[in-house]
Amino acid sequence: MAVKRSTRLGCNDCREINYLTFKNVKKNPEKLALNKFCSRCRKVVVHKEVKRK
């Protein structure tokens, strides 16, 4: 059975957390990095996985 955990994606430029997504921890243990639109920067930038608090 797959272990999916919710992860938050934060903008690489302004550090704002904009997206919430799910990832399979067993298949992809490394951090996610996706190109997404940041509403604060008003452009498409890399959003990386933010550490859970």
UniProtKB/Swiss-Prot annotation:
GO cellular component terms, semicolon-separated: cytoplasm; ribonucleoprotein complex; ribosome
GO terms for biological process, alphabetical: translation
UniProt key word Ribonucleoprotein: yes
GO molecular function: structural constituent of ribosome
Coiled-coil residue windows: none
Keywords from the UniProt entry: Ribonucleoprotein, Ribosomal protein
Signal peptide per UniProt: none
Pfam (any one): Ribosomal_L33
Family in the record: Belongs to the bacterial ribosomal protein bL33 family.
Record protein name field: Large ribosomal subunit protein bL33A
